[in-house]
Amino acid sequence: MSRVRLVIAQCTVDYIGRLTAHLPSARRLLLFKADGSVSVHADDRAYKPLNWMSPPCWLTEESGGQAPVWVVENKAGEQLRITIEGIEHDSSHELGVDPGLVKDGVEAHLQALLAEHIQLLGEGYTLVRREYMTAIGPVDLLCSDERGGSVAVEIKRRGEIDGVEQLTRYLELLNRDSVLAPVKGVFAAQQIKPQARILATDRGIRCLTLDYDTMRGMDSGEYRLF
């Protein structure tokens, strides 16, 4: 079963790792998920956390000072240090087994076709994995480019701004993994709206228009005996 813990607390937050970052005292939502991820949220950033730690990570409590400090540490030794000044709400909830996001038929087929014909992304590209799982959901395709660099690909039937935002979240998360980083992004769709293309380009994400009919007609060796 999936258990999520919600805490609303007056707190300060310090990130200690490759960089350092400090969030001064404020009321915040702390979200602890069953996969081990921890995220810190404010009321003004929609779905985006102020800071977070991806799994695997571990939560311990230091109680030697004036206020308890919740320390979230990952395997790389990076830490989120959350100093708790006061707790207004603390609850845990069973969410059950989530069926996951079900892609429509065209998107699922586009993903399968692009995985099979990965050279459409560029010469020298190789497929690492389909549905590469992250703490916030699966990346459609994880690939390597001609230089061995990591590339995350998000595939849509219609490429809109929310798809670019989704890929941006994946990239922010994947680029915190020292094994994969740096990770580039490709936003692939049958049709990409101008606003989505502008946003993607501004964020350094490459756009790729997919011709579904042409891809369906491409030669496949999947069932070939010779």
Curated annotation (Swiss-Prot):
Signal peptide: none annotated. Its EC number is 3.1.-.-. Its main location: cytoplasm. Belongs to the NucS endonuclease family. Keywords: Cytoplasm, DNA-binding, Endonuclease, Hydrolase, Nuclease. It is an enzyme of class 3 (hydrolase). PANTHER family: ENDONUCLEASE NUCS. It is found in: Cytoplasm. This is Endonuclease NucS. The keyword Nucleotide-binding does not apply. GO terms for molecular function: DNA binding; single-stranded DNA endodeoxyribonuclease activity. It comes from Mycobacterium tuberculosis (strain ATCC 25618 / H37Rv). Gene3D superfamilies: 2.70.180.20, 3.40.1350.10. Disulfide bonds: none annotated. The keyword DNA-binding applies.
